[in-house]
Amino acid sequence: MPFPFGKSHKSPADIVKNLKESMAVLEKQDISDKKAEKATEEVSKNLVAMKEILYGTNEKEPQTEAVAQLAQELYNSGLLSTLVADLQLIDFEGKKDVAQIFNNILRRQIGTRTPTVEYICTQQNILFMLLKGYESPEIALNCGIMLRECIRHEPLAKIILWSEQFYDFFRYVEMSTFDIASDAFATFKDLLTRHKLLSAEFLEQHYDRFFSEYEKLLHSENYVTKRQSLKLLGELLLDRHNFTIMTKYISKPENLKLMMNLLRDKSRNIQFEAFHVFKVFVANPNKTQPILDILLKNQAKLIEFLSKFQNDRTEDEQFNDEKTYLVKQIRDLKRPAQQEA
């Protein structure tokens, strides 16, 4: 009978046991260089063996039974959590292997069940360790890859959204390292847009806190953060699932004032993204009195400003149609008393 675990002749249980032991050696502060080197080699070797079980090799497809055994061993031993907790102790290639192993095991399905998702729901610390990974440059991008894979699964996205740690994203997207800040923003955006109903529920329940933090991003000194945040705000407000949130946001005069200021930003791209949020205020047929007052007070200035606004975008038909529509809407604005007369 052929051995089911390929040429390494190591069972999933052996691989997990060896890897756990090698990780325990690396965790010790006072080990000799020789021992550390040996443990690092063992970790690399066992991670590769684990990948072969999950992904197969050129000669051999993955074996369902071996994959199931490996998954079970990872849960029972707590190794999945250890690999995330000790990611910075693993070498460069090994970190990439961990992310591939983690994401593969996370996607694993048995019928309609996703056992690793169920497991992480009971071991939520794994999610928060991944999130905290953004604070360590050497593991930030690996953690981002695993975190976004987690967010594909609604139960895991919900745990993060409803956690106190979610608000750490407002720090991470402002980080000075461009790659890390961009990666954090991609994860942040995923959380707010992937599961529409879940995101709408979250934004409705946490509106005040979320938008008071979000406004700081719109004032960011960092051009990329400011532009991405403005673009995402436009997407969130125009998504039909977020109708309640949009209605609330566009009823507040301070939000309109901010967009009018951003329309005059020194960056053309920021102006353009601000336009897409500003248009929602103007197009709203049920404007609140404070919004109407601001638009009427600035009516002539706005008409003149919009008539000349980015006129060189001649190819962008939709933008020009929207601009024409807004100018007409602002020109037709009247005070309610005048309308009744």
Swiss-Prot record:
GO terms for biological process: cellular hypotonic response; intracellular signal transduction; negative regulation of potassium ion transmembrane transport; positive regulation of protein serine/threonine kinase activity; response to activity; response to thyroid hormone; signal transduction. Coiled coil: none annotated. Keywords: Cytoplasm. GO terms for molecular function: kinase binding; protein kinase activator activity; protein serine/threonine kinase activator activity; protein serine/threonine kinase binding. The keyword Disulfide bond does not apply. Changing F243A: Abolishes activation of STK11/LKB1. GO terms for cellular component: cytoplasm; cytosol; extracellular exosome; extracellular region; ficolin-1-rich granule lumen; secretory granule lumen; serine/threonine protein kinase complex; Z disc. Belongs to the Mo25 family. This is Calcium-binding protein 39. The lineage of its organism: Eukaryota, Metazoa, Chordata, Craniata, Vertebrata. The gene is CAB39.
